[in-house]
C-alpha cells in the first residue's frame, strides 16, 4: 500500500542484488549502509547510495512513506546518531532475532534470510511501479 517505499540495505543483504535491482527498477527508493554498498549500483536512478548524511538525501527520504530495513543495523554513523527520521511504518528483515528494533523501533520484524525474502518480494512486484 506504500506509495513510495524506502529500502535500506545492510551487509545482511549482500546476496540480494538481483531482487534489489528488480525492486529499484519498479521505483523503490534504495539506500545502503556502508556494509551494503554495491548491492545496487550507485548509478541506478533509484539509488541514494551509501553516503546519506546530507540535507538533499534526507529530503528524499522524507518523501517516502514506508521503510523496509534489510540486513542493516542502522548504525549511528549512518543515521546521525539515530536522529535521522525514517519513514513509518518500518519493517525489518534480519536473520538474527536479537536485531529486532535494536537501534530504531520497528513496527514489525521478519526473522528471515534477506536473500530469500527479498527474492519473494521481487517476484510479487511484476508490473507494479512506485514513485
Tell me what each language-model feature is.
Residues 8-93:
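Glycine-rich, anion-gripping cofactor-binding loops and their flanking helix/strand elements
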Residues 1-2, 86-131:
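Phosphate/pyrophosphate-binding active-site segments
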Amino acid at each position: 500500500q506504500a506509495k513510495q517505499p524506502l529500502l535500506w540495505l545492510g551487509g545482511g543483504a549482500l546476496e540480494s542484488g538481483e531482487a534489489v535491482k528488480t525492486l529499484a527498477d519498479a521505483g523503490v527508493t534504495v539506500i545502503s549502509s556502508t556494509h551494503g554498498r554495491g548491492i545496487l549500483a550507485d548509478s541506478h536512478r533509484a539509488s541514494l547510495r551509501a553516503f546519506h548524511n546530507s540535507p538533499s538525501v534526507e529530503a528524499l527520504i522524507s518523501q517516502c512513506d514506508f521503510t523496509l530495513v534489510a540486513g542493516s543495523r542502522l548504525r549511528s554513523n549512518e543515521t546521525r546518531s539515530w536522529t535521522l527520521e525514517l519513514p513509518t511504518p518500518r519493517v525489518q528483515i534480519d536473520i538474527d532475532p536479537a536485531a529486532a528494533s535494536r537501534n530504531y523501533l520497528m513496527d514489525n520484524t521478519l526473522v528471515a534470510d534477506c536473500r530469500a525474502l527479498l527474492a519473494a518480494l521481487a517476484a510479487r512486484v511484476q508490473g507494479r511501479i512506485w514513485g
